């Protein structure tokens, strides 16, 4: 779907541009100014961002097979982390086509990105504190992953975007038939019908 592909490429370009403009060409960068941590000024601190030494495992949803991959891949690569992409089985062929184009471009070092279209097997058992798991999908699967013994025991950083329940709020001062009301109805209709409403903003 054009929204999926164009949105994914657009998101990736925004992240890459932000990295090019705002981050140094280095393995670490200083985030913010020196801050006083004690009343006397004897203790000060400053955030220094460095990449984790592990891998980013991205378990993605079915409804945006390209966008989901690219929007997670871009910041991970920018942070210096290799990526393992695990797309949803239902749409993994679409993800694989886009992935093969990335590999064929030879823009990334060999092994910087990998794709698993089947079962993860025992991959999660081998992750540690320098690794990251990012999941998009159902609340039930998110709960299952979040409570995986190896992720807990090894303090693996886990992020989840799960079943979205979104509200659409229209101000009480908006009158039926006004341009604002008509736009609101049009946008709500679009959100619940595009991709059968199966997207995070529906």
Regions found by a protein language model. Give the residues of each.
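ALDH superfamily catalytic-core signature
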Residues: 104-106, 129-132, 140-202
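Short acidic capping loops at alpha-helix termini that bridge into adjacent secondary structure
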Residues: 54-55, 109-113
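Hydrophobic packing residues within well-ordered alpha-helices of enzyme cores
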Residues: 12, 95-98, 126-127, 145
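N-terminal Rossmann-like NAD(P)+-binding subdomain of aldehyde/semialdehyde dehydrogenases
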Residues: 1-41, 88
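Beta-loop-alpha module in the N-terminal Rossmann-like domain of NAD(P)-dependent dehydrogenases
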Residues: 56, 63, 117-124, 137-142
């Amino acid at each position: 779907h054009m929204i999926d592909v164009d949105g994914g490429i657009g998101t990736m370009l925004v992240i890459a541009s932000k990295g090019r403009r705002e981050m140094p060409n280095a393995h670490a960068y200083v985030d913010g100014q020196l801050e006083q941590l004690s009343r006397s000024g004897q203790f000060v601190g400053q955030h220094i961002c460095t990449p984790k030494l592990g891998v980013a495992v991205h378990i993605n949803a079915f409804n945006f097979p390209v966008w989901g991959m690219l929007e997670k891949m871009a910041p991970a690569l920018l942070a210096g982390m290799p990526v393992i992409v695990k797309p949803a089985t239902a749409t993994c062929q679409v993800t694989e086509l886009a992935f093969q184009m990335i590999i064929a471009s030879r823009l990334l070092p060999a092994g910087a990105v990998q794709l698993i279209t089947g079962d993860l097997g025992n991959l999660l058992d081998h992750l540690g504190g320098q690794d990251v798991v990012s999941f998009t999908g159902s609340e039930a699967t998110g709960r299952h992953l979040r409570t995986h013994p190896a992720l807990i025991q090894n303090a693996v950083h886990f992020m989840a975007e799960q079943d979205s329940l979104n509200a659409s709020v229209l101000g009480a001062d908006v009158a039926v038939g006004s341009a604002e009301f008509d736009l609101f109805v049009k946008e709500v209709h679009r959100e619940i019908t595009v991709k059968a409403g199966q997207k995070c903003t529906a």
